[in-house]
Amino acid sequence: MTAPNGTTPAAARRDTSPPYLERGSRSYWRASVALLFAGYATFSLLYYVQPLLPEFSTTFGVSPAQSSLALSFSTGALAIAVFVAGFVSEGLSRHRLMTASLMLSSVLTLVAAFAPHWHQMLVLRALTGLALGGVPAVGMAYLAEEVHPDGLGLAMGLYVGGNAIGGMAGRVIAGVLADLFTWRIAIAAIGVLGLAATLAFRALLPPSRHFTPRRGLGFAQHRAALARHLAGRRELPVLFAMAFILMGGFVTLYNYVGYRLLAPPYSMNQATIGAIFVVYLVGVVASPWSGRMADSLGRGRVLIASVVIMLAGVALTLLQPVAAIACGIACVTFGFFAGHSTASGWVGRLATQGKGQAAALYLLSYYLGSSIVGSLGGRFWSASGWAGVAALVATLLTAGLAAAAWLRRRERSGAA
C-alpha cells in the first residue's frame, strides 16, 4: 500500500514529522543561546563560592575542608537532583522545568547572602543544588532531541561554553565584589544576575518539537531504562566514569588554589585572585572547538587530548611563578571543558532511548566527582599543601587517560 504521492506510509509519516533544528537556522541559534544562558546561570550560581571559601573560613571559623562543604553540599544535592530530574522530566514540560529550577535557585542565592550562621549557609547551598537539578540533564536531553545530529556537537559545545562563562563570571564577580565590599554583597549580585539570565532563557528557548511527555511511568520502567544504559552499551558506564574523573579533578584544583594564592609568598587579595580566574574563559573556546573536532576527527581522539592537556596543566601549577600557575589553571580549564563537551555529546549519541535518563546518569557521576573529590582535596591540602592536591588530581586523571584510550579503541572498531 502506498500513499497518494507514491511513497510508503512510513515515508509519509517521516515527511510530516516536525523538523529538527538545523545548524544555521534562526531556531537553532535561539535554542543554542537560550541554553548558553542556562549554562551561565547554573555554573555561576553553583561555583561563585570557590573564591569565597577563605572568607567563609575567616567569618565562620571553619577549616578549609569544612569551608569546601559550601560547594560540596550543592554539588552533592545537585547529583541527586539531576538523577531524579532525568526521570521526572520525561513526564513534564522541559521548558517549564528548567525555568522553574533557574528561578528558584536564583532566589535561594539571594537568601544565602543574609545567612547568619554556617549551618544555615550549608542548608541554603544544598537547597540551591537541589533546585538546579532541573537544568543540566534536561538541557542536554533537549538538545539531543531537538537539534539535528549534524549540528549537535556545536550546540552542545555552546551550552557547555555557557557553563564556562558562568563559572568565570561567578568566580570573578564574587571575588572582586567581596574585595571591594563584602562577600554578602557579592552573593546578592550573583543572585540578581541569575534572575536576569533566567528571564533571557525563558524568552529565547523554542518549544519542544520531538518530545512527548510520558506520564505515569513507574519505577519498573525507570529501572529498565537504567539497566539499558548501564548494561546495554559498554561505553556508557565508562563515559559516566569519565564525568566523575574530569569534574572531580577540575573542581578540586579550583577549590584550593585560592588558599595557595592568599598565603605567602603570594599574599594576593580576593580581587587579584578573581582576575586570575578570567582564564576560565578558555572554556568558552574549548567547548565549541571540541565539538567541531569531535565531529571531524572522532570523539576518542579529542577525549584523550583533553585529559593530556589537563595533566600538563596540573604539572605547571607545581611551579612557583604566578604566570606558570595561571597557565596551568588555563590548561586544566581548557582540557576539562573540551573533555566534558565531548563526553556529554557522546552520551547523547549512544543513548538511542531515554536520553533524559542517560543524561541524568552522566551528571550524577559528574557532580558526585565534584562533591566527593572536592572535599577529599581539603585533606590533601591540610596534609601536604599544594603538592598533595596536585598528586590527587594527577592520579585521578591518569585513570581517566586509560579510560579515554579504551573508548578510542571502541570507536575505531565501530562499536561506539
Descriptions of predicted regions:
Residues G300-A343:
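C-terminal transmembrane helical hairpin of 12-TM major facilitator-type secondary transporters
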Residues D15-S25, P206-F240:
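Juxtamembrane intracellular "pre-TM" segments in multi-pass secondary transporters
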Residues V82-S93, V285-G298, W381:
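Helix-to-loop junctions at the C-terminal end of transmembrane segments
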Residues I80-H119:
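Conserved MFS/SLC helix-loop-helix module at the cytosolic interface between two early adjacent transmembrane helices
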Residues Q120, P149, L158-L205:
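Helix-loop-helix hairpin linking two adjacent transmembrane segments in secondary transporters
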